[in-house]
């Protein structure tokens, strides 16, 4: 009986340690490419490594990296506060966003570590309520 209980116990531990399938990625550009993307909730997101507002390749990407994160206040986030992880695979950058609000920049890099292109990630829960006034008019 002790042996059976031990086997069941070990089996439960092994099952608990199994990795679940990764959270599916939400593509950020289903219709058009961009240089800035709005993320309104935590999750896994992806976008193609093309130059903003076009379909031209940014070059031979081998890695992706978060260059900086900001809450837009006088408080500085620690690394990973907004973007938990970022990677490059098969022409796409994939990242995991937290539920915090702010801004981040993700860069595509070549084999020498040179930045080929970067994208602004704007993390807000109210993108439809944002307005920016300038001499050219109002941007919403």
Question: How should these model regions be labeled?
Answer:
Residues 19-21:
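Bacterial signal peptide processing site
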Residues 15-17:
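C-terminal motif of bacterial Sec signal peptides marking the signal peptidase cleavage site
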Residues 88-101:
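Extracellular/luminal low-complexity segments enriched in Ser/Thr/Pro
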Residues 2-9:
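Sec-dependent signal peptide recognition
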Residues 23-84, 131-140:
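Solvent-exposed, low-complexity, repeat-rich "mucin-like" stalks and linkers
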Residues 113-130:
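C-terminal edge beta-strand
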Residues 92, 103-105, 116-118, 139:
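Extracellular structured ligand-interaction cores
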Residues 101-111:
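A short beta-strand micro-motif common to beta-rich folds, especially ectodomain repeats
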């Amino acid at each position: 009986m002790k042996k059976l209980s031990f086997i069941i116990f070990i089996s439960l531990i092994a099952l608990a340690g199994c990795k679940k399938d990764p959270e599916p990625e939400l593509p950020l550009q289903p219709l058009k490419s961009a240089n800035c993307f709005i993320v309104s909730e935590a999750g896994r997101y992806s976008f193609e490594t093309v130059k903003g507002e076009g379909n031209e390749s940014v070059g031979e990407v081998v890695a992706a990296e978060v260059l900086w994160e900001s809450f837009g206040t006088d408080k500085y986030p620690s690394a990973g506060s907004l973007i938990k992880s970022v990677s490059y695979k098969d022409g796409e950058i994939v990242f995991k966003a937290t539920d915090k609000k702010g801004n981040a920049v993700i860069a595509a890099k070549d084999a020498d570590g040179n930045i080929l292109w970067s994208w602004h990630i704007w993390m807000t829960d109210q993108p439809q309520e944002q307005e920016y006034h300038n001499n050219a008019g109002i941007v919403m």
